[in-house]
Amino acid sequence: MVTALSDVNNTDNYGAGQIQVLEGLEAVRKRPGMYIGSTSERGLHHLVWEIVDNSIDEALAGYANKIEVVIEKDNWIKVTDNGRGIPVDIQEKMGRPAVEVILTVLHAGGKFGGGGYKVSGGLHGVGSSVVNALSQDLEVYVHRNETIYHQAYKKGVPQFDLKEVGTTDKTGTVIRFKADGEIFTETTVYNYETLQQRIRELAFLNKGIQITLRDERDEENVREDSYHYEGGIKSYVELLNENKEPIHDEPIYIHQSKDDIEVEIAIQYNSGYATNLLTYANNIHTYEGGTHEDGFKRALTRVLNSYGLSSKIMKEEKDRLSGEDTREGMTAIISIKHGDPQFEGQTKTKLGNSEVRQVVDKLFSEHFERFLYENPQVARTVVEKGIMAARARVAAKKAREVTRRKSALDVASLPGKLADCSSKSPEECEIFLVEGDSAGGSTKSGRDSRTQAILPLRGKILNVEKARLDRILNNNEIRQMITAFGTGIGGDFDLAKARYHKIVIMTDADVDGAHIRTLLLTFFYRFMRPLIEAGYVYIAQPPLYKLTQGKQKYYVYNDRELDKLKSELNPTPKWSIARYKGLGEMNADQLWETTMNPEHRALLQVKLEDAIEADQTFEMLMGDVVENRRQFIEDNAVYANLDF
């Protein structure tokens, strides 16, 4: 019946004694956001990760190698693994079977207390009990001791005692649940792509584990993807560099442990200028970095400088490379596993364990140094690339000074073309990046000057995918944006200094407008990515048509809407249609009413759901390999709607 269950006879003494009980579940249904972040679509998907994380823990401990996630009819989720099966013996303190305790008591699980798992994933670690509390129905089947055990729950409450329902020659756990619509009022429908992206990431981060995702909601169109990477994060780096030109064929790869900290690093340089560094701790993407990232950067800079000087590629001490120089054109992934990870930072995605810094530094520096001496040609290319980056950095320093604002209140240094807003509260302020001066004039007249700022952009901005920072900072339009935003750029970037929490790209609904949008998004992604990650970047949706019938005006945003409206309207009185070719054709009142008024407008928020997908798409659209770009356009032309 279940493909992911194990034939292996796991006899390790993972039993009820290793399940600790800390507190009850009463609060979970009252304040679900405290436990899963939110009750939005994101929180809904978080339920799946809590169950999958438990299966990954079994795999990390060496007891499972297959996990299967199925979206069943009516958006039930089924997660199956071939681990040892959750313990079913009586848990001493509670006097109930361990599986029931795990599913009904908050923080009761093998990951608390250190007896069950050396390393466990999951940001909240709140586990199965929270999923149970927030599900209208949940069922568990445990294959253990040659017996199949079963129990069912409603909103976290057991419906009957754990019972034996059959015999088995396999081991493992099956959990089925349906999220409670009373809690998840926004949606209880799962997004296949959201699940697929994280499952692929987990397969990269846990080499050798096979994770399968299947969607059975449409019987005639069952979809399935299975991921299994023996190369782990090495394969991940190769995928990220797929559309780039690597300087060395094989990624540099290290997988070692020291002081009970497991360190896995893969790094490959390419001929481009952007740095792509992804860091993970216990499978959690540490967006804000942390001590593992610090240790890696410190070792990388020290070893490259040491090699450059000793091999005489760099002549003197004053030629030393900065950290930023050594990372130009680098794609790297750092993944550590730690028994007690400490997460800090605004979003709890920054690793705080100080001991990790030294371990990563030591393990990586020894391995990297050996690689450089064994591959002198590659080593020379990497060092020389750093030297070129250093020269560009010196040139960029001058340009960068122009863009640095002394403080968010230093209005004197703001660009002359900027029509700023009067409010000094970034949370309510928004800036519209408007294509062309003529449209800029209309938007300035039609805005709410208290909270809306306008920055007209003249002509095309630079394609940053093909340029170094010094050239980028010499581009007038880019300099004006950096100064207006107040955040700095690249290594100097500080999200807390953002002067606006909404940055709205407002371009014409034509091919040129689409190109400018792409250029701006490429710049934000490569040099101001936290703006996208924080949800500050939006795309305005100006209307494409105005349909007039008598005194009635209708603004229409795409051809589909237009066809629908035409079919619904009476033929009399006669109506006329005007197509807007550009923002400049609208007067100030029309622009305000259709595109800028928060009461009526539609804004498209730019989200970064999949780092791999985004990186490859920007490289494909804006990079040097024409053939890949042509193929991408041919494959996606049918979906393209340049009118947004």
From Swiss-Prot:
Biological function: A type II topoisomerase that negatively supercoils closed circular double-stranded (ds) DNA in an ATP-dependent manner to modulate DNA topology and maintain chromosomes in an underwound state. Negative supercoiling favors strand separation, and DNA replication, transcription, recombination and repair, all of which involve strand separation. Also able to catalyze the interconversion of other topological isomers of dsDNA rings, including catenanes and knotted rings. Type II topoisomerases break and join 2 DNA strands simultaneously in an ATP-dependent manner.
Enzyme class: isomerase
Intracellular or extracellular location(s): Cytoplasm
Residue ranges constituting the Toprim domain according to the UniProt record: 429-543
Encoding gene, per UniProt annotation: gyrB
Single GO MF annotation: DNA negative supercoiling activity
InterPro entries the record matches: DNA_gyrase_B_C, GyrB, HATPase_C_sf, Ribosomal_Su5_D2-typ_SF, Ribsml_uS5_D2-typ_fold_subgr, Topo_IIA, Topo_IIA-like_dom_sf, Topo_IIA_B
Binding site for Mg(2+) 1: E435, D508
Subunit description: Heterotetramer, composed of two GyrA and two GyrB chains. In the heterotetramer, GyrA contains the active site tyrosine that forms a transient covalent intermediate with DNA, while GyrB binds cofactors and catalyzes ATP hydrolysis.
PANTHER family: DNA GYRASE SUBUNIT B, MITOCHONDRIAL, DNA GYRASE/TOPOISOMERASE SUBUNIT B
Taxonomy of the source species: Bacteria, Bacillati, Bacillota, Bacilli, Bacillales
Name this protein carries in UniProt: DNA gyrase subunit B
A UniProt-annotated Pfam family: DNA_gyraseB_C
Transmembrane region(s): none
Comment field (misc): Few gyrases are as efficient as E.coli at forming negative supercoils. Not all organisms have 2 type II topoisomerases; in organisms with a single type II topoisomerase this enzyme also has to decatenate newly replicated chromosomes.
Annotated family: Belongs to the type II topoisomerase GyrB family.
Catalytic activity: ATP-dependent breakage, passage and rejoining of double-stranded DNA
